[in-house]
Each structure stands twice: as structure tokens, then as C-alpha cells.
Amino acid sequence: PYLKLKARPRRRNITAAEYVEGIRKGNVTMLGQAVTLVESQLPEHQSLAQEVIEKCLPYTGNSKRIGITGVPGAGKSTSIDVFGLHVLNRGGKLAVLAIDPSSELTKGSILGDKTRMEKLSVQKDAFIRPSPSAGSLGGVARKTRETIVLCEAAGYDNIFVETVGVGQSETAVHSMVDFFLLIQL
């Protein structure tokens, strides 16, 4: 009468070298897992995340980094959808790091920016990673700089960083990008 569930086999731990190999080969699943590892606040993940970042550093610095900000509702995500398709049509690869505001109470986030990038989100040479700001100031997530390193190591030659929205705290992204774009109503 009761449904018997089989225990799932425990996943083996992935090594830093395996993460880097997957990232370098353009494996987006491995890239996504590495970003999750870097964003994790668990102490047991931090040393592995640091090792992955260090091993990726030699493959960085060759991208165009663009920070995109504006008041909520100005059309940041919609503009990224259009700009991103233009980048891809010219033969580039694009990573979009979309930072969403988080609830002060739960630190959770809707992570809805990706849904507004309808055309871009289905392109094979586009990687869109929504991340909660989790209370970080500066318009970016706590580990945005490290995520940029991972995306560059994966061969993304264009990186857009969409901030939570314009305000007096939108300064941290400025030091991470080559160009800063303000979208106004």
C-alpha cells in the first residue's frame, strides 16, 4: 500500500579541476554549478570555490564588460534582450548577470529578469544568470566579480551586468565594468 522510494545515489563531489575543465569546454551546466558554488555561504564550499576561481584567473580579462542600470521599469531587461541579440548576431558569446533586489526579511528574490529576455534566453551562445542581491549594496550581488571571472574563463567575450536599479548605492558595479550604461524613462 505504501510507495517504496529508492534512495538516490549520493552525488560524488566535483573537484576544482573538473569544474575548470567543464567551464573551459563551455559546459553551461558546469558553469551554473560553479556560480552556485561561488555564491554559497557554506564554509565547506568556500575553499573549493576559491580554488576554482584561482584556476580560472589565467583565462580572464578578454571580455567587454558592460554595466547596465536604470530605475525599476525603465526597460533594462528588455534593452538587454535587444542588445544581446545584436552581440550574438555579430558572432560573440554573451553572459548576462542579472542582479535582482532581495527581500530584506527573507533575503529571497523573484529572479524575474530572465523571463523578460525572451529571445535571448533561448540562444545557445547566451548564458543568463539571475542572482539575488541578498542585501548587498552597490547594485550587484555579493559574488558578481567572481561570477565574471567564471564567465570569462568559459569563453564569454561580452558580459552584461544588470544592476538592481539606479540609486545612490549603484557604485560597486562601476569598478567591475569597462562601460556603464544608464537606461532612462
Predicted segment positions?
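Nucleotide-state-sensitive switch-loop elements of NTP-binding domains
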Residues: 15-66, 74, 79-169, 174-185
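Charged, compositionally biased N-terminal leader segments and the immediate start
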Residues: 1-20
